[in-house]
Amino acid sequence: MLVVSYDIKYDKLRTKFSKMLTKNGAVRLQYSVYEINNTERVMNNLMVIIENEYVPKFDGGDSVIIFDVSAVKLKKYGNAIHRDKDIVYF
């Protein structure tokens, strides 16, 4: 599982980046923090996309931090707990 956190100054690039993460299976945890729980191939492709398409467009203050996190060692509190539970509809 990856946790992606970003700080991008320009609205257009930030929106495009956010949509790209969602398109690749990311779930928003907070405003600029996403969780990606996908196959290793998809996660590696995502990092290539970031490096090739977004990093060259970054301004001096822009940043993306990617954490490779073990789901076993992850601890969630508050609203984040409910995101992992199944929803049953009748």
PLM feature spans:
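A general marker of short, structured functional hotspots
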Residues: 2, 13, 27-30, 50, ...
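Short acidic, gly/pro-rich beta-turn/loop elements at beta-sheet edges
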Residues: 16, 44, 76
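Short, charged/polar low-complexity linear motifs in solvent-exposed/disordered segments
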Residues: 22, 46-48, 84
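Extended, hydrophobic alpha-helical segments
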Residues: 1-41
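C-terminal structural segments of small proteins and small subunits
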Residues: 55-90
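Short linear motifs at secondary-structure transitions and domain/linker junctions
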Residues: 8-12, 39-45, 63-65, 85-86
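Short, intrinsically disordered low-complexity segments
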Residues: 29, 36-60, 73
